[in-house]
Amino acid sequence: MVAEIMKGLNQFFRQFGTAYIETSIPESVSFPYITYKCGSEDWKGKVLISCSIYSKSSSYKEVSEIAEKILDSARDGFIIDIEGGYLCVYLGEPEFQIVPNTDYSIRQGYINLVVHCEVK
């Protein structure tokens, strides 16, 4: 079940660009990219997840554009069909935040999401 859930989440994030689980970012990553992590291993009911958007830029324009696409898709709930059920991705709180980075050539923002998991 967890493998199907992670596959579904990857499918969701990849529609906005290259996406990785936060612990599996390749060393030779190309910008922009998205990372995501789950706040729980227990996929019963609702789970909090967060994603970060990274851009190699001097402005937050690219980060904000990608964030807006993710926010728009999750605003009313985004359904992801998985084997044996579905996931529904909603906005969490706070929705979107800019993250200061010590490397001034990289811009980062993060989004909080809630995933409702319904499996048989």
Regions found by a protein language model. Give the residues of each.
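Charged, amphipathic alpha-helical segments and their flanking helix caps
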Residues: 1-20, 27-31, 35-120
